[in-house]
Amino acid sequence: MAIYKQITAEQVEALCSGFYAGVDEVGRGPLVGDVVTAAVVLDPNNPIEGLNDSKKLSEKKRDALYEEILAKALDVSVGRCSPLEIDELNILHATMLAMQRAVAGLRARPDRVLIDGNRVPDFTDETLEGHAVIKGDGLIPAISAASIVAKVVRDREMEALDERYPEYGFAKHKGYPTKAHFEALEAHGVLAEHRKSFRPVKERLEAC
């Protein structure tokens, strides 16, 4: 796993040429559920307007862009790591593994992979060119698209989990460590879907 410093605007422009994939993750901070990553290859001949960091978009806008990405992108792949894998590996290494899985799931090998953040996972294909771009989800459209796909996929999984366990409020807080989530943990206990290595969950288990 390599660590990279911020690249320049000129470098960003150069990287966004040719057949490349953008990669981003969602769900490192929550106490429950998978960490989800996405890899997206956009079609330069079929642009998508309004792409941005998923956190800066409304849910309605994200959902609309998600459908447009699936319809227009050349390739979309989702990778994930389960709570069990997160507990075994730690969240950083689980995120890197999920990114590896997303890239491996692409139908065609890209010329390079551009990843939001300052780390690049060790790809199985050692010849694959990888670049970390700090705040890339707001700079590079393919990374923005990946952030939107990962966010919508994970949010919908939290909504499905909320249907199974409405007392935890997952549809509202999406599994993040909010006051409501802490209160639900205290009142109802730890679920199989919780990340047992995360401190609030671990402390609740130890208190039993």
Curated annotation (Swiss-Prot):
Principal place of residence: cytoplasm
Keywords, alphabetical: Cytoplasm, Endonuclease, Hydrolase, Manganese, Metal-binding, Nuclease
Binding site for a divalent metal cation: 24-25, 116
Assigned GO CC terms: cytoplasm; ribonuclease H2 complex
Location of this chain's protein in the cell: Cytoplasm
Cofactor(s) in the UniProt record: Mn(2+); Mg(2+)
EC number: 3.1.26.4
UniProt keyword Transcription regulation, yes or no: no
A Pfam family hit: RNase_HII
PROSITE patterns: RNASE_H_2
Statement: the UniProt record of this protein carries the keyword tRNA processing: no
Catalytic activity: Endonucleolytic cleavage to 5'-phosphomonoester
Cofactor: record remark: Manganese or magnesium. Binds 1 divalent metal ion per monomer in the absence of substrate. May bind a second metal ion after substrate binding.
Similarity-based family: Belongs to the RNase HII family.
Function: Endonuclease that specifically degrades the RNA of RNA-DNA hybrids.
Name this protein carries in UniProt: Ribonuclease HII
Species of provenance: Shewanella loihica (strain ATCC BAA-1088 / PV-4)
Name of encoding gene: rnhB
